[in-house]
């Protein structure tokens, strides 16, 4: 299984982080460009690969945490006083949405390497000394999905999934 995972992850090398979307608190990172057209004729980028994150994660450089998963629950304006009506679900109202957009628009970062660990974690190294670390933090042995990498390059999508019970591919 390790060889299969390494082969899949090696296909990410050289792809840029091009887009991010969100479904609730699940971040969806897009690498490369793969265009699809919906039933209304609108064209959009699904990425050659999409990484759906359902575990804690963070982007770092050598000096700081650039953005982390829990920034979703912080207001976009870091200097404003707490707003009891703050709605993290509103797009771009939270710090995570704003900082991820800034990371993508102000940097062209491409993948240099990607590795998994025995606990379901994932580390992706980008150029410019930027790193994405996904670190599952559940001790539960119940079926919990940590992250999913989806390959959109072909008609049939392939998935690499990290679960509390191990890795799965199709």
Cite the ranges covered by each PLM segment.
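Surface-exposed, interaction-prone regions used to assemble/regulate multi-protein complexes
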Residues: 1-170
């Amino acid at each position: 299984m390790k060889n299969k995972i390494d082969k899949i992850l090696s296909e990410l090398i050289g792809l840029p982080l091009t887009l991010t979307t969100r479904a609730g608190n699940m971040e969806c990172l897009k690498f490369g460009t793969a265009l699809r057209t919906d039933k209304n004729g609108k064209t959009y980028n699904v990425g050659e690969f999409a990484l759906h994150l359902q575990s804690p994660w963070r982007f770092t450089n050598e000096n700081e945490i650039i953005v982390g998963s829990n920034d979703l629950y912080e207001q976009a304006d870091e200097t404003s006083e707490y707003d009891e009506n703050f709605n993290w679900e509103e797009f771009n109202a939270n710090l995570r949405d704003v900082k991820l957009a800034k990371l993508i628009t102000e940097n062209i970062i491409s993948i240099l390497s990607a590795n998994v660990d025995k606990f379901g974690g994932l580390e992706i190294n980008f150029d410019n000394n930027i790193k994405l670390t996904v670190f599952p933090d559940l001790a539960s042995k119940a079926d919990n999905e940590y992250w999913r990498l989806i390959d959109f390059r072909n008609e049939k999508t392939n998935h690499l999934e990290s679960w509390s019970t191990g890795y799965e591919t199709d």
